[in-house]
Amino acid sequence: GAIEACGHKVLTLPEYQGKVKAEDVENYISNFYADDTYLHMVAPGMLYISFPTEYGTIYSKKELQDIHSVCKKWDIPLYIDGARLGYGLAAEGNDVSLQDIANLCDVFYIGGTKLGALFGEAVVVCNDSLLKNFFPLIKQHGALLAKGRLLGLQFECLFSNNLYERVSRHAVDMAMKIKQAFIAKGYNPVVNSNTNQQFFLLPND
């Protein structure tokens, strides 16, 4: 995909309902550097996770803290995909705040289009050392918007009067009604998701 088209390599880890475990990250990196031929292999350079995941599951604060600690130990950035961040923050049982997200990663982004914005996402860089040459890289990849202020205006609105939180909460509440309606009809969810991502297996008939 887009990552490998830019010259990087995607290295996969085991997933548990869409999530990765800190011990798997630790084992992968430690085993990599324990190999005498590691200089001839693709080095792990960043950890990419999603909150919530593609299954709608969410990481606990403890899970994020553990993953963050491993990344710090091995000096690799932690990137959190927040395309549906608002729905994760609004999920019942979530103990992670927006401030926690900022404290426990190097870069994350706040999804816009999946919460009602017309276009764009807001990238939040928490590690200033990663900003070197960031603007030239944006231009190099053809990603510099001519009227970027219009993107920013959307987030100014979303983060006024708790709109971002209200939109997220409403979507999750509606999803829970749909979830309960399916369960009442005898269908079981593929995973237990408390976000607006709900997946059920239905018979072909």
What is each stretch, according to the model?
Residues 1-205:
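Conserved PLP-enzyme active-site core in the AAT-like
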